[in-house]
Amino acid sequence: MTNTNHKPARPRLMSATPLAFGVMCLALMVDATLGMALAHGVAEGDKGFIQESSGVLFWPFVYLGAKHMITGYDHLLFLAGVIFFLYRLKDITIYVTMFAVGHSITLLAGVLTGIQVNAYLIDAIIGLSIVYKALDNLGGFQKWVGFQPDAKIATLVFGLFHGFGLATKLQDFELSRDGLVPNLIAFNIGVEMGQILALSAILIAMGFWRKTPSFRMHATAANIALMIAGFLLAGYQMFGYFTA
């Protein structure tokens, strides 16, 4: 006799989430390595505009800053790791602010003072910042080192490196001194606006995933994928450093 009370198992629609997250991380890195020589690459059209511009061009530089952040693979991967286990808006705001402060300081100071280092090395460190955050999310420091770095300080420090990487790249464009400071401020404002837009999209996606049982089950796999992406970026930059 057929059991009419039997209910078919519900499909686990979210079981592919960590795989999708990993594919996204790896796809971003492959696209970055194929399309850019450096993690802070700038589109050819934007390069020409930056090099030829003179005078205060507030809104165009706001647009360029926002575009850089939204298409910045390294920034997005690092920030995804930062907010991975943050649930309260207060905590997210604190960490994002720490990153933004660090990014702003070195972006402005690096260009205005002319301090410059090898861009490959800076971008390799930025790749390792992604590895660090993924390892931190996995509890690796406490398990293997017996020491837990201060997450807020680490976010500020890596924000300094992220900003310095962009400052190093911008200095290659021989920016006009006419309107330089207002344009840099506008660019930085655009970066922060782009960061808000990118984080909003990430938070919406993460919010849906966190409500499912698969989040805790597959968080480890997702952070391993994030770590692999960071190693790929760092390895690519070191290859460029030794072969350029």
PLM features: residue spans?
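Histidine-/acidic- and/or cysteine-rich, low-complexity loops and terminal segments associated
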Residues: 2-71, 147, 238-244
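Hydrophobic alpha-helical transmembrane segments in multi-pass membrane proteins
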Residues: 68-73, 78-243
